[in-house]
Amino acid sequence: MTRDDRVSNLKFGGISCHCPTAIMKLSVVLFVAASCLLAGAQVQATYKDGKGTTHWEQHELDTAISPDERERLVETMVKAHQIVDKERSKQRRYSPKDTYAPVNVPCPPMPEGDNYVGFVRNATNQSLNPNEAAYVKRHRQNNKRRWADWLKRAGMDDNGVPGGVDSFLSDERNQPRVGFAASGGGYRAMLVALGVAQGFDERNKTAMDRGVGGLLQLADYFAGLSGGSWATGSMAINDWPTMQSLVDDVMDLSSNLIKPSDDKFSFYKDLFNDVSDKKDAGYPVSISDYWSRALSYQLLNKTDHSPMFVHHGQRTTYSDIVNTTSFKDASYPLPIVLSIGRPPNEIMINPNATYFEFTPFEFGTWQPYLQAFFPVGYLGSDMRLSLIHISE
């Protein structure tokens, strides 16, 4: 199976030893594509000073949050950060476990195949990851009978399908290829993507009555960028619940992400603690860590309110998706999260910027000057010549 087979899916359904190893946090993956959204919003909302430093326009800041609210929020952040620094200066946790910080794990077995150089997969031949190809093949085999039922419900048995649906699908090459593509746009894009997924869900009676229900389960891929990736990741890591139950029982959308209504101090204290864990483990941190960790409170497993925020979503990794029941059964589309590369300090995204993708199996890009992939579960590992470097 090649990349062309996968791309055709998205075009068809474009709806819109111990080694120092970093376990990729799902919250970080949910963030990586958000730069596109932020960059688009900054076109008319920023200016550069004489030194070339970019600043927000004051009226944009005041629109997002009033000066008084901003001052109180900064005071809360500073207080939480000071307490975290004070506590951590007394007792550092050099080997955090089951936290947001990356951890050391046994070295994985070396991938097998002629197109692997160490742990890096050479994708110049445009072939898919063997695990991805196997998943999609099993998913399509599981859905052969369901495709026949769906096409018959759509009235295509005696109208438009030569020889009838059953005869047409007897050749596996005729089985339709469908993929969903969710655009960026923050929470709006996320909710639209969830609404679209619900509209094609076989568990939705209205969708079944209208003849479109079941297409979600039949699709081979569900890809998302920026806000669309928040929906994609949340659906997949939570084992594809109904969209209504995901919003009602898992997500916490009633609380503001920046100034939560429940307990601002606990929120920021836990946020600073988790990111500090990663820093203490020897890994670089950035604003991406704070933003993605904040997103995880709302989009991953249900928040533990006793105490508020603590441990919520911090242990979840993107590669955990492969352990869900739906993924093991290959009963839902393979999720793909997309992101766009952007150099430091660059505001506008270059039209020729590199697109990267994250699947539950690997991370990388198809663009010609790279065309390489790496196991997503070990992102952050110190690599030397395609091999994991073991620090002395």
For the regions a protein language model found, what residue spans apply to each?
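Intrinsically disordered, low-complexity basic segments at termini and long loops, enriched
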Residues: M1-I23, H389
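Extreme N-terminal leader/targeting segments of oxidoreductases
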Residues: R92-P96, Y100-S167
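Patatin-like phospholipase A catalytic core
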Residues: G179, S183, Y187-A193, E202, ...
